[in-house]
Amino acid sequence: HNVKKYTAERDAVAVPWATQGYYLSERPLFTADPLFHAGCYYVQEASSMFVEQVVKQYVSEPVRALDLCAAPGGKSTHLLSALPQGSMLVSNEPMPLRAQILAENVTKWGNPASVVTKNLPADFASFKDFFDFILVDAPCSGEGMFRKEPKAVEQWSVSNVEMCAERQKEI
């Protein structure tokens, strides 16, 4: 589909660090859009798209990449678009339900150079020196969601922050 026409109709402004990223003036109901369900685009925060700049800066030839904590798949789909032709991406998520969502999103994206796994991060220790590029966006307390999701504030707790910190240490 024509991304420029599609985004112009929605009063979109380009994200400076992402070639196909756009800020929208209002949040449409994406779940009612057949193009969203077809995998034509993925909705995520602009900050999540910064991974494209890392790839542009450091990756110039095909690589084997690992997105260790990949669900729901925004960074993985963005990586699949940014990595050089001939690269392979392993998108991992140990939580079964989240891994299913990840697999759906990566499949809809339509890039065959990807594999989805459901392993614990420690399982990849035996792959020392196999991956050229590893992305770790470790699970966190969700404070970044406060401005767009009021319920996130209600779900915040010190114990959740501590649990996330322990999980990050394990990863």
Describe each PLM feature range.
Residues 1-171:
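S-adenosylmethionine
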